[in-house]
């Protein structure tokens, strides 16, 4: 028998049946009647069975709960119901599919009064982030902690892992093998010695591998397939002043003149050249780079060039800059920029992890503990002026690890507390933490790359973190703001005939306070239920304040000893994605 019927937006007719877990639907265009039965868990027959329920949400989903249980959504492509929770009987089945009621709000959040769990909220979002894990069975281990990333000109991805194995994946990210000591990419054999900390491919197609403790490796392809390489390892030799200055190579870089530079963690910087006999020489502080400030800046971890003819070195004691268009290394003049306690325009922190020149010819420095620094100017006498950005400006953490620029000139920064996007034109940050990413991630130092397809790859303790910046969309939802409570002299004000409030505070347009009621608080809330803990607020009392007060996530404001007058309280908020949309209430 048919107990009730419902016609959905597409004119499909749904019939309630008295058999538990069973529902029928009729397509008037095809004349087909389909009977569906959803598996439900056993329950005591003496208990009342949950009722039939059906509704459609703002995203066009049709939700059906047959009599007795089996909460499902309708797949219009496959023309069948799909159980909302894990399949009954599967090992990870956790939830009852029996509900008493369901409701979808204006944002599409699904609210359910369930048979056993009480009230539950389900939110939906596209997840543009993914993780490529070298050894899936060991999520956070040395086998998955990424220290170096490079995409070569054939689209192969070179992945340096902390376990010392340099893995290579093809353009489809299928595992090809690892680099062996004899230069072959294979799944067998002795891995090439050394943990890769930085990898580049130069303009001639040569792969350069910076290792921690095992020097610098030059890998020149010996086959068109890119499966074999001639390897040359360069090491520090105490009795050879033209050898590599230190075996701990943290970064390798090719400048605009084709020079290869190596930043070492105990010997400053080097660049490679050759003598008349073709022998490779490393030019460093021990021979011709006499001007390099080796004593304070011997721990170099990064090197790059800007768009103004300078090379920049990131060290643990600040940044070093010099002209890259030199003829004699002895004549190079170096400028050292560091944190000066009484200079607000100096670097915010001396531990510089990453430096990036942008398309708009700006330069940004990522520090380990001092946030982001933007170069403003360098005076003729070598004094640098910087503008710093910290957690107070929207960064999720002041510990920054690496930066990449997308095709819209936004900067993507891996931090100790998630990843964020910096929009230079607006000087604004958008953060993505574990709640946005939907899985835990802990980023590694100085491991990132931008692929030819525009994908961003960042190294993490659990693998390669992957996303395409153009696929990330912030919510445009504008939440209404309501006033939720009024407190006068630390006493809650309840509406009533003898009260200050004749109606609820949110329905009150005007409030009159006497001279002895000049200490009061107002609570407010933006009705965004997706991630309400991320909503941030600002307020202003017109007639008393001239600037907005940014209250972060605080949802109340208190005023004391206001002088006589008329005032208007206005409140603004972001939505739960952190977008400031200038919603207001007064």
Sequence positions of predicted segments:
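Carboxylate-rich, polar loop motifs that coordinate divalent cations or form catalytic acidic clusters
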Residues: 1-584
């Amino acid at each position: 028998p048919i107990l009730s019927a419902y016609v959905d937006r597409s004119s499909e007719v749904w019939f309630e049946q008295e058999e538990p877990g069973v529902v029928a639907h009729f397509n008037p265009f095809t004349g087909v009647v389909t009977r569906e039965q959803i598996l439900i868990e056993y329950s005591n027959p003496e208990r009342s069975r949950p009722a039939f329920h059906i509704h459609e949400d703002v995203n066009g989903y049709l939700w059906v709960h047959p009599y007795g249980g089996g909460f499902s959504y309708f797949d219009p492509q496959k023309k069948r119901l799909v159980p909302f929770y894990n399949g009954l009987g599967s090992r990870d089945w956790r939830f009852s599919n029996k509900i008493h009621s369901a409701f979808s709000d204006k944002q599409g959040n699904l609210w359910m009064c369930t048979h056993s769990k009480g009230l539950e909220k389900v939110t939906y979002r596209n997840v543009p982030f993914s993780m490529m894990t070298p050894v899936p069975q060991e999520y956070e281990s040395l086998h998955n902690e990424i220290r170096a990333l490079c995409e070569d000109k054939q689209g192969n991805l070179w992945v340096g892992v902390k376990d010392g194995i340099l893995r290579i994946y093809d353009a489809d990210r299928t595992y090809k093998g690892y680099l062996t000591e004899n230069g072959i990419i294979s799944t067998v054999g002795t891995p090439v010695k050394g943990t890769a900390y930085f990898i580049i491919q130069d303009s001639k197609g040569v792969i350069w591998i910076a290792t921690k403790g095992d020097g610098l490796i030059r890998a020149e392809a010996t086959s068109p397939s890119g499966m074999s390489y001639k390897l040359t390892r360069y090491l520090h030799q105490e009795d050879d002043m033209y050898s590599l200055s230190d075996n701990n190579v943290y970064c390798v870089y090719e400048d605009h003149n084709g020079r290869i530079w190596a930043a070492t963690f105990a010997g400053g910087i080097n660049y490679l050249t050759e003598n008349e006999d073709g022998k490779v020489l490393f030019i460093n502080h021990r021979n011709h780079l006499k001007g390099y400030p080796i004593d304070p800046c011997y721990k170099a971890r990064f090197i790059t060039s800007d768009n103004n003819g300078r090379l920049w070195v990131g060290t643990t004691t600040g940044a070093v800059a010099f002209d890259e268009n030199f003829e004699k290394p002895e004549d190079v003049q170096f400028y050292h920029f560091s944190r000066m306690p009484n200079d607000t325009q100096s670097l915010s922190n001396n531990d510089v992890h990453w430096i990036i020149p942008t398309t708009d010819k700006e330069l940004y420095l990522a520090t380990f503990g001092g946030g982001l620094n933007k170069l403003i100017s360098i005076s003729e006498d070598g004094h640098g002026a910087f503008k710093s950005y910290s957690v107070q400006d929207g960064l999720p953490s002041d510990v920054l690890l690496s930066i990449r620029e997308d095709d819209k000139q936004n900067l993507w920064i891996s931090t100790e507390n998630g990843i964020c996007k910096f929009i230079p034109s607006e000087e604004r940050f958008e953060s993505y933490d574990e709640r946005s990413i939907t899985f835990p991630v802990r980023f590694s130092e100085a491991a990132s790359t931008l692929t030819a397809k525009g994908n961003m790859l960042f190294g993490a303790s659990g693998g390669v973190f992957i996303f395409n910046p153009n696929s990330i969309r912030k919510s445009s939802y504008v939440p209404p703001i309501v006033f939720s409570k009024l407190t006068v002299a630390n006493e809650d004000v309840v509406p009533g005939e003898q009260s200050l409030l004749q109606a609820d505070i949110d329905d009150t347009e005007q409030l009159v306070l006497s001279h002895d009621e000049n200490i009061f608080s107002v609570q407010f809330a933006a009705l965004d239920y997706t991630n309400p803990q991320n909503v941030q607020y600002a307020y202003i009392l017109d007639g008393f304040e001239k600037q907005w007060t940014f209250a972060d996530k605080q949802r109340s404001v208190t005023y004391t000893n206001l002088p006589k007058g008329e005032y208007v309280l206005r409140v603004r908020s972001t939505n739960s994605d952190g977008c400031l949309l200038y919603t207001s209430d007064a």
